[in-house]
Amino acid sequence: MSPDRFPGWPHWLPIAAQRPRMSPDWWPWVASRDSLTARLRIASPRPFSVRLLTQGVTRPRLDEAQALGLPHRTHVWHREVLLRLGNASWVAARSVAPLEGLSGARLCTLGERSLGSWLFRQPNLERGPIEAIRAPAMTGLDAWRGDAGPWGRRSLLRVGRTRILVQEFFLAAMAADLSLPSR
């Protein structure tokens, strides 16, 4: 089934397809292939922190299962966090990974540390294509829905046998603090 048939499902597009809709100010944030954590730390003098919202085993959303090549009813590890600068939440992130291949990955022990702080230290890290979404409030992450900014992005990252779908949603506070436009 295609997400087009169900308007409540997220509709992710390749990053290049979203570029005409995106302000040049947002492009470096949404299209960057390096560590978002590192970029956030550079962008603000305020202290960086991670607020863990939830972590555990669940079933993926249909679009997540499709991106990971899994049956929809499969159980996955998931983690939702807010990336904060000072007291402001700049990014909401949701990561999903198949349970097989997780042993030794240390994902469950990250706690209040960013996933990027582990991922981007791995010498065998591979990042797949980046996809973007214009209306990230449709993704079902209720903890920050009222603070949604204009863009979200996701990509599949691999470290050995571990596959992780990382989804990052830029929030209104980030746009306001960096004087970024609404698109």
From Swiss-Prot:
Binding sites annotated in the UniProt record for substrate: 79, 115, 168
A GO term for molecular function: chorismate lyase activity
Similarity-based family: Belongs to the UbiC family.
Gene3D superfamilies for this protein: Chorismate lyase-like
Keywords, comma-separated and alphabetical: Cytoplasm, Lyase, Pyruvate, Ubiquinone biosynthesis
EC id: 4.1.3.40
Function comment: Removes the pyruvyl group from chorismate, with concomitant aromatization of the ring, to provide 4-hydroxybenzoate (4HB) for the ubiquinone pathway.
Top-level taxon: Bacteria
Subcellular location: Cytoplasm
Record's keyword annotation contains ATP-binding: no
Broad class of where this protein is predominantly found: cytoplasm
Annotated protein name in UniProt: Probable chorismate pyruvate-lyase
